[in-house]
Amino acid sequence: MRVITHIILFLFAALFSSAQEKIYFNSSNPFSFKDIITNPNLQTNQTVYGVLTMPDDFDSTLVYPLIIAFAGSNGWSTHHYEYLELYQSNGIATFEVSSFKSRGVSSTVGSQVDVTTAMMVLDAYKAFEVLSLHKNIDKDKIGITGWSLGGGVTLFSAWGPLKNAINPDVHFVAHLAFYPPCIVVPTILDFGEAPIHILIGELDNWTPSDACLELVNQMPINSNISLTIYPNAHHSFDRDAPPQIKSNGYILEDCRFSMNEEGAVVMNFFNIPMVTPFLQKLGVGMCAKRGPTYGGNKEVKQKALEFSKEFMKQNLLN
């Protein structure tokens, strides 16, 4: 009986190890998009890891579509995993990127300088390059998703000048951004041909929905970007906890910035590029307040889960 038990445990462990694995890859630490576009070889090297999870019906002889996923400024939470599990149950592999833990950071709420959007976008492409070689991943069916800060990563991973600077041969086939910060508008509005969709709450004062609507409305008429604004929904509308105040977070409703072709976000007041932590804090501090509201709306959460499933099935499974 003991031998049989050991065999069962061994087989279970082998199955689990084949369906989920921790993967390391090389990235770096650019502070801004400008660092990637103009100084790609001057950045410090950084080892980053993530967890690759295969679909529930995993067969080691097959290849699967993949979603590379990024959490927000508070790191990974329960509601994020609900989406990943939903994708896995529908035949899609997921890769949970640990951009924060890889750099020894637990949260960037209220600062956004220890781990930046630029670092995470670079992580996304470096992860793509490695995972596209995996024997069970379909390199032509890789999408990206993220929440809040990770939503910004998802959105700007499609920005042409940045993508071309990192790897013009790598193409995400779908971008699903949850409540991203849309407060930066590039002078070059090139976001590629792959479908981009933004899900955001009407009442979001952390990453305001008005900014996303403004960005989408400025896009060229042939852009493949769309937007859903959920009524009566705050930031992190897909959390289970009710709305509450995040005292050290930023209220960004009054903040709008432009970004030049080199990837430098410009302080609108003085036309100064915010390419250092000090300048970024100064620029944001001049327009932002503290204490945004975040928390769940059960009805909206269910709508977002259903939309996410159908969006990814349409773009990764068809």
PLM segments and residue spans:
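N-terminal cap/lid segment of alpha/beta-hydrolase-fold proteins
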Residues: 19-62
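Short beta-strand element of the alpha/beta-hydrolase
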Residues: 61-72
